[in-house]
Curated annotation (Swiss-Prot):
InterPro entries registered for this protein in UniProt: Ribosomal_bL19 (IPR001857), Ribosomal_bL19_CS (IPR018257), Ribosomal_bL19_sf (IPR038657), Translation_prot_SH3-like_sf (IPR008991)
Pfam families: Ribosomal_L19
One Gene Ontology term, aspect cellular component: cytosolic large ribosomal subunit
UniProtKB keywords: Ribonucleoprotein, Ribosomal protein
Name of protein: Large ribosomal subunit protein bL19
Gene that produces this protein: rplS
């Protein structure tokens, strides 16, 4: 029975997702239905948490909008998530960046990860 479930879940996994980690700044384009038409809405922010559970994987993105912190959780393999674009890699030493919720201003900044060429 579980082999059938695994096979069905593997069919629905997205393969075109970029590699991203906590601390990275990403732009998530989400399909939003308004009335009878559908459009893409971009949500740009810092990834503060990732939950890897196969088809049930999720990640949380945090941004500051009009001086107010906004967090949004996305299902990684959801059909509502159109695309994920990594804008900037962040150098952090934690898997969950919940401490950013209490920080504001310069203390909430994340250093950029230096990559070898």
């Amino acid at each position: 029975m579980s082999n059938i479930i695994k096979a069905l879940e593997e069919e629905q996994l997205k393969s075109d997702l970029p590699k991203f980690a906590p601390g990275d700044t990403v732009v998530v384009k989400v399909k939003v239905k308004e009335g009878d038409r559908e459009r893409l809405q971009a949500f740009e922010g810092v990834v503060i948490a990732i939950r890897n559970r196969g088809l049930h994987s999720a990640f949380t993105v945090r941004k500051i909008s009009n001086g107010e912190g906004v967090e949004r959780a996305f299902q990684t393999h959801s059909p509502m998530v159109d695309s994920i674009e990594v804008k900037r890699r962040g150098a952090v030493r934690r898997a969950k960046l919940y401490y950013l919720r209490e920080r504001s201003g310069k203390s909430a900044r994340i250093k950029e990860k230096l990559t070898k060429k």
